[in-house]
């Protein structure tokens, strides 16, 4: 893609030139995992000379390493939004969500008031075996105080993760105590899950939620499908809402389970990468089952590959809102110091031939696209969706569009009927999350005895958690507005209770609770009940009469 931009000669650009010279010269004259850098030498000589001039004559000593680290992200950002540089330190955790496991202590945590709070402890993991409990506050790591502004997600993960069988000493404060407990945890392999929920929506409909597409997503899906088969499911909903993508191969494996032999799943093509087709091999076990795929504005990349394959082959119905629109393929390439880049090398195309990548020539517009769509009303009305890309056709002849995500077959607007400014402030301020953590800590002993989401829901309603939240919010700057609270009562109660359920139980229980009155789930069940999950061919145009 040609991207003509005016470039001013600024210190940053000089740094970029230096880095390019470095890459051409001796500083980075090594391999990307066996792949040599190919850079045009005619330009390289000039830039390399510039590097030597700066190194020889610049008024101050130049730290070449610092220039590299600062300028690499800027270089790649000139290409596209998804080509990125990852430092060696960040590279340790960059792919943890997509790997089948990582080495750590086995906790889920949040950071509140500059302190790590243990949200959940993974069963039979290193932290649980050592005695760490949900609700603990971690204030020391290896005898060093770890609270305050330095406590970030990245820094916390860097300190808590580490090689298997190494030890980390934690200083924790337990709820209701003042004294620091010291606990030594031996790090171990922690499994990561992509399939975060799997259960029966009703007597016939199975439901699977996929958070991302990692190394183990396909086997996790097969296990979930096998369990649903034991329950006798005869139709399936795959929820990709909020799924930001992952490995293309994982999406292809899953699509293969539902498509017939020879059907195209996706193809990729780039300037240096010839077209490569990925087709179903006919061995999938669920080629005939009625299928619905749920997407929203956060569904991206590999999630869009799966949704596009199902839609273009008319294999099932897509329900939700228009997806993100990421149709670029990145290849990881590692430097000798273990830093790496993810470079866009190709685009992917759905079976009908459409590239669903949204335009990115204007970086500011690209980053602001989500808010632009929101303000334009696209989340609330299907008529507000603008199709600027070319039209394509599915196997049955239905019209679909490229250039900006997967548009669902059935649109589900964001629910704003009972939304008020009080609700928006309560959610956006983080007060609901803060209240949920506080309430959980204060009632953990009682709540932890409940293993069933519906038992917990009944209990929370009996405790009038909404009123408790309103009092908490009033004390923390969000003044009570009774009329608005009454109008948004259902939304507020749903949000408050869902976060408490998540804190105590797990993501499966949280998903089940939210799905019970989810408009997209309700529409899915209606579609299956009416036998309309398989898209039909467009009706022939009615004859004209004169």
Where are these regions (language model features)?
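Short, Lys/Arg-rich N-terminal segment immediately upstream of the first membrane anchor
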Residues: 1-9
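Cleft-lining beta-strand/loop regions that shape enzyme active-site pockets
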Residues: 2-3, 27, 31-43, 47, ...
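Hydrophobic membrane-insertion alpha-helices, especially the h-region
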Residues: 12-28
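Extended, small/polar residue-biased N-terminal targeting/export presequences
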Residues: 58-119, 165-197, 515-525, 532-542
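Structural motif
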Residues: 135-137
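Hydrophobic beta-strand signal
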Residues: 139-140, 266, 317, 342, ...
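Polar, glycine-rich mid-to-C-terminal structural blocks
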Residues: 302, 314, 321, 325-390
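Conserved functional hotspot residues or short segments at active or partner-binding sites
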Residues: 355-356, 360-546
